[in-house]
Amino acid sequence: MGDSGSRRCTLVSRLPIFRKSINRRHDSLPSSPSSSNTAGVHSSSPSSTNSSSGSTGKRRSIFRAPSISFHHKKGSEPKPEPTEQNLSISNGAQPSHSNMQKLSLEEHVKTRGRHSVGFSSSRSKKITRSLTEDFEREKEPSTNKNVFINCLSSGRSEGDDSGFTEEQSRRSIKQSTKKLLPKSFSSHYKFCKSVPQSQSTSLIQQPEFSLAIAQYQEQEAALGRPSPSCSVDVTERAGSSLQSPLLSADLTTAQTPSEFLALTEDSLSEADAFPKSGSTASHCDNFGHNDATSQPTSSLTAVSKTKMEFVGTAPCVMSPGRYRLEGRCSTELHSSPETPAGNRREVSLQSTELSVGNGSDPETHLPAHHQRGESPLAHAGEPALRTGSPRTLGSYDQHKALAERFKGVHPVSDSRVIPSSGDHVFNKTSYGYEASAAKVLASSLSPYREGRYIERRLRSSSEGTAGSSRMVLKPKDGHVEASSLRKHRTGSSSSKMNSLDVLNHLGSCELDEDDLMLDLEFLEEQNLQPPVCREDSCHSVMSCTAVLLSPVDPGKEVNMLEEPKCPEPSKQNLSLRITKDTDQEARCSHVSCMPNSPSADWPQQGVEENGGIDSLPFRLMLQECTAVKTLLLKMKRVLQESDVSPSSSTTSLPISPLTEEPLPFKDITRDECSMLRLQLKDRDELISQLQAELEKVQHLQKAFASRVDKSTQTELLGCDGLSLKRLEAVQGGRETTHRNRTMSQSHSTRDRKAIHTPTEDRFRYSTADQTSPYKNICQLPGLCLSNFLKDKELGGVMKHTRGNHEAVTSEMTQNSRTTMGQSFLKAAAKPEGLPMFSEKPKDPAALSRQHSTFTGRFGQPPRGPISLHTYSRKNVFLHHNLHTTEFQTLGQQDG
């Protein structure tokens, strides 16, 4: 139940909300979870945790929630009982207690997570409420200020962290905690909170530490799975490993009380002065702050994780050790604000290396810490911790404590160490990366830099989360996840730190699309600048280690409980050696500020200690994967370069040529279509021009016709008839008009008609010629040119006809009275025979109409539209008197 409870709570805590709140709640909650969890065991650790987390919680008014969660933990869980109870409970009651703790922790995290950073929650988990309250009271003013400052500093990034961390934790929680999440989130959340405590308690119960470790490993596996929620995961997983050590009298509690006291004190100074890495809580805060500052979101989440681990374990374990480490490690880690992140990394690395380097130490160290933890539970923790710690106190004790924190949670069961190794590798990697990242953090401390890396980290952390969810069942996965999250969160620096190392891990473990993409960015950098890929490689390494080690973890966890360090050290050595080589390489360059950092030296020791039997195959696998990745990336680049068009670039090589080939054809077709369209437009314009010209010519012809018939009124009628009939049928109307015109002319003066009929015939034929081209133009636009030429010819003909008309008009005016046109009239009437005779009956009416309508318009050619002349009083009256006699004569003749 403890495992499931812790996993559930981890899963729930992994939820972005819970993650955020858990990180902060763990910050504010430390005393609360600790007091409920470690009635006695955590009480020593709680003092410092409470001081930092309690002050944070109280300052943030979230501490009430921790107290509630403490009530949950205390009331619902037996864990609130002293550490001894926790020790006894750790195996049996721990599950429920851890579940309760997780519940309360999650509640605390919920209430408090947003405000407090993960370090507080891990502390709170590891500190008994009474101790927490005591330390709160003792150090609340300063510690709370420091913690609050740290929380605030980390809180700045927490806001960001909450976003990315939540997303990452959400992904990881969703992936890793889907199975457990179905259970009530609140319950899991509470269990998550209590489980870390119970895990700490079980770790506190280090006699049962193997079993507790198994449980904790399971819980941590659950926690580790949720570890994407960095605060809760790391807090819980680190809470298992960190909190558990802190809570557990074994590792952290013994150290935690004094360390937390020191942490609280140091945290006051450290929180105020980050360079003081002495207080892990402050370190965690600082880390949170630095990471949060440098990597507001991812860094903070990683910081929360790291903080949780460091706060949980590092504060306790590292407090004395870290005080000393602080002297050294804080110089190294706290060499710069980023150093806290680096410190985190280093602490993680140190703890990783401690756990790895002290693969066997964790057990001995755990018992020592366990003994120390129990004595620290009596607040002999600091003295005991420092007593036990002093030997390791420098970096070693911290590493031991960290190893215990990591391995302390899984120290006896180095199955845990495998997760721990995975975690340590990743912690070391993440912390080693973060150690480098710490340096990078100095520059990385800028939120901008983190923002850039945060995106990658988010992607990577989501990958890492996915990887962790893949590794969900492995506590190491949780640690790996947390480490990867830390790496990614600590972020840019971590990616810069050991990106090559991580890439190697990445390559061997999993080739994720994101990893490939990230490696695309960092592949060359990876070779040239390994840190750049650190993030991706961290995620990949996390995933890889989780994939490679996680399959072994479930069984190995139990087996490792029995055979705690045998398989794990090798795997730890695998990952640690790989990470160590890369980390040390990166550290040599990046951790130069922390050259003395045990993590830099210890990973190698741990790796060498645990032996690198598996490291070679693992490394070979990583190299092979990396080579494959490189080839794939090269292929991708070649494809991208070879592809001319973006669409072809997305397609595979065989497709791209095909895609390229059709493109020319399409272009050709498009060109042809455009050319054709242009031609059509030109032709249409030509047609319109020709039509306009034809209309003009027709108007001219009308004018000519009226001009030709100016001496006769019949021509005007003919023009009107033409205009009316032309609407109906151009040719037919024109011909009919000519016929009517001819008939009226014949009825008028035969001489005039004799002269005019040939003209009409000629004009009519020319008009027919014009009309036929017009039809052709309308029907066959393709013949525009030929039609245009024809129109030109017609224009010439029209001009010629115009001249003829003028000549005919002059002739008609001269010979208007001649009688020689009678024979011509007959000749003209013969071809038109039927129309003439058929229309003759209508002529009288037409003539009368003409007479009435066109009176006074005789003899003057119309200037402009016929209608104007028809209705022009001027024309009518001017010409009326002049032509009255002539008109009467014509009428008589027609009659």
Swiss-Prot record:
Which residues fall in a compositionally biased region of kind Polar residues?
83-102, 348-358
Region Disordered: what ranges? 1-142, 154-177, 332-394, 459-497, 731-753
Compositional bias, Basic and acidic residues, is annotated for: 131-142
Keywords on this record?
Answer: Coiled coil
Compositional bias per record (Low complexity), positions renumbered to this chain: 43-56
Stretches assigned to coiled coil: 675-705
Q: Per its UniProt entry, which superkingdom is the organism in?
A: Eukaryota
Indicate the family of this protein. Answer: Belongs to the CCSER family.
Q: What is this protein called?
A: Serine-rich coiled-coil domain-containing protein 1
Q: Which organism is it from?
A: Mus musculus
Its taxonomic path starts at: Eukaryota, Metazoa, Chordata, Craniata, Vertebrata
Gene name, Swiss-Prot/TrEMBL: Ccser1
